[in-house]
């Protein structure tokens, strides 16, 4: 998420400037922040009760501990400027200038460092953001997650399963990534099969290297996957808006082999 401006926070800035507090609770301040984030995200964002004020002095660093919730950081004041480094632990690191009256949303489990060239005051609050919620589910002898940081993706029994719908939520296709290529899942005589195809949309399989036997792959294609747990994210394909739900799966090889043998 890039830095974005926040408006109408002068009441918050004045309160922090005139009160020497590290933590506080203020429902009005929470509403001001949540309204700004809701406008930016176009979804309902819920903040935790406690607002945390952090002061970063000259050439100091503020380290954010990775958390299962999202974190919203607002730059309240800064003398000399500051930058923020965000690392989601999957070779995706961003270093951004962090101006006053701007905010940034840190995704769950991401690392973050604020570096100040002069005295800087930031406001930190945890938030539940539907599109960024972490999902973990174990069903059909498969561990499903929606964030690679939650899974050991080095085993070769890992795959990606995704559902694509149109803007009106009408089903377009299901796709699976296994054996280092994408397949579309098609139905023949009430059974589903993987057919090699291009990936529809913007999904990346950059960090997945899998090797799954054909019988197992077909078995996985015929399972019910917990897409109802995953937020639908807007994507674009050939300039056409689509929605994507994506899960990473890791197969329990022992139980899966038993399940396949009795199919």
Swiss-Prot record:
Keywords (A to Z) from UniProt: Early protein
InterPro entries: Vaccinia_virus_A37
Induction: Expressed in the early phase of the viral replicative cycle.
Similarity-based family: Belongs to the orthopoxvirus OPG165 family.
UniProt protein name: Protein OPG165
Organism this protein belongs to: Vaccinia virus (strain Western Reserve) (VACV)
